[in-house]
Amino acid sequence: MESMFAIIAKELGVKPGQVESAVTLLDEGNTVPFIARYRKEVTGELQDEQLRTIEERIKYLRNLEARRQEIINAIMEQEKMTDELMASLMKAVKLQELEDLYLPYRPKKRTRAMIARERGLEPLAEMIVNDTVTSGNSLDIAKEYISEEVPTPEDAIQGASDIVAEIVSDSADFRATLRKRMWKEGFIQAELVEDNEHKDQFLQYNEYAEPVRQMPSHRILAVNRGEKLGALKLALTVPDESYIQYMVHGITKNEQSIFSDVKASAVADAYKRLIFPALERDIRNELTESADEQAIKVFGVNLKNLLLQPPLAGHVIMGLDPGYRTGCKMAIIDAQGNVLDYGAYYLTNSEKLKQEAQKKLAEKIRKFNVTLLSIGNGTASYETEQFASKMIEEEKLDCHYIITNEAGASVYSASKLAIDELPDLDVTIRGAVSIARRVQDPLAESVKIDPKSIGVGQYQHDVNQKQLTHTLDQVVESVVNHVGVELNTASPAILQHIAGISGTVAKNIVAFRQENGGFTSRKQLLKVPRLGPAAFTQCAGFLRLNGAKNPLDNTSVHPESYELAERIIGELGFTLKDLQDKSQLEALQVKLPLVDVDKMAHKLDAGVPTVRDIIAALAKPGRDPREDLPAPLTRKHVVSLEDIKVGTVVKGTVHNVVDFGAFIDFGLKTNGLLHRSELCKAKQHPSDVLAVGDIIEAEIISVDVKRNRIGLSVKSLRNKDKKKA
């Protein structure tokens, strides 16, 4: 049997030794971000995603092995183990295979077959199964089994048939074959429930059928939702008679048996009563699990790209949380995120109130030198955008606006964290502050919100919530550690996502900072309560200290590699102090790209990946990797439905990526749908081509005013470019 390491290595296309090293590091309590960044030599430079897959797969395979041993022990206790069964158990590579093999030996509730055995009908059942009787009358033979509990020959045959049905149902071979055939030949069929209040949402699925093997995840989740709401009836349809005949043929030893018809009926009963319901349930569950996995993956990719949006630093920002009845809440923050002013204004009511609001807000924009308006994308967003565009034009203001994803802002504004951060502000104003800060530093603000509330997925409320939470937490952890955080300004909300730091330790770090006037070196982390050497090893490299005594504290170089970093600097004719001298640092940065990494690593007896990473860190101390990405799209003018028509080319921001395409915000109230057929090749997923936050140009190919739908295409633009060329 292949080792677990070999199995995972084959799946990932890496070497078994890499997997073994990664598992050893994980078992020792190291975190994925730490291993990915600082143990590259040990793992052969395995990436974050690969390490997480290894973590999940080794857990599954260990559970599989534990279950295998449980089953072997249980069967041995029953003294029913055979060499053939043992071989099959040892070959099983899925939990489902093990459970199928264990089914005949699993303790059962009192079944019809059990009752029949208790009544002495097992010998009759064996005659039926083994086809040993080829002459005489079946009822005459059955008479021999009449008793007080079995009053008639027909009752005897029925009881024996129940035993036969259970034998057939318990066959791992039959179940495995039928399961494969159902996946290959089955259809999911949907039927609309006419008197259901939700039926209008699912009209497209009335009398709908699709092959099991071809159903995309978003369609599986859609029909599942319809079933859950009682609007759809779902069923798995397969060639039942073909399957029954296959099993009858498989269990027949002699076609001349007088019990042939009895056996055929027992097989049909086994299929309809026991096998099909179980396999239908298995297949539906597998479909749902697969769809959940895909939806969660898409959500994770979208969340990652959203969190990696570059910060719009240096702006004084006015956050606008739109609303109708209670008005639009406004908050102005400075370049450090501190609240300068706030209030509520009516931007969507009477013309008089709108004019008053315009004058007052324009006055504040000039007073505080606001350069950017951040408008939440919820209720009344489009009307607020129209107001902002008109105000900027009429008041001749030197600022732009941006539409910001406000999902989760209301949840955050009422949270304990928001109360602690903004104790003097009303709950409604806190939402406006959050909308402003999300533009200033999307990562720092978004980590304060439950990732599930951010709203960049598909069917996120329908999928396995435990798995969704687990995956999204991993995404947040990966992004936060990839970017790194400033130790002296980071909130507990973001610190708790750093490798090795818990929520309690994050609060202790902030408390230490407040009591001691801030950190001056990474080493001081060891003085923080409950942050010991092991946690320090995990977290230190991801925490930056601008202005620290040791300039390496403001880089991604891990303290364990400081000595190596100094030697590299020395080899180039510089000292550590030169990193704090602008002209010397610039001179060093000219030399760094010219270094032969392999030679340097060999000379210093160090790992090539570590030397490469140290050189990259020295080249850009304190670098924020988000700065390399294109800045978000800001606007001065609103787009109206009258401005667009088929053939218009628009520029917009990718708001969400799903299995069937992407939704693009190009300044209209409704996001345009860029269907995958108008975006990418057949086998590509939209997320292979686009990411949340990307700025793209697309052509409008359809406008449905009645249904409020706009269709977009990038393929048409490519085709036009080809013709021009």
Question: Regions from the language model: what does each represent?
Answer:
Residues 4, 56, 62-80, 90, ...:
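Long, highly charged, low-complexity intrinsically disordered interaction regions
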Residues 15-16, 28-29, 95, 121, ...:
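Short flexible coil/turn linkers enriched for glycine and charged/polar residues
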Residues 38-40, 129, 239, 322, ...:
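Short, ordered loop/turn segments at secondary-structure junctions
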Residues 74, 88, 98-101, 226-239, ...:
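Structured, non-catalytic alpha/beta "coupling" segments that mediate domain-domain communication
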Residues 548-549, 553-725:
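Single-stranded RNA-binding regions, centering on S1/OB-family and related RNA-binding modules
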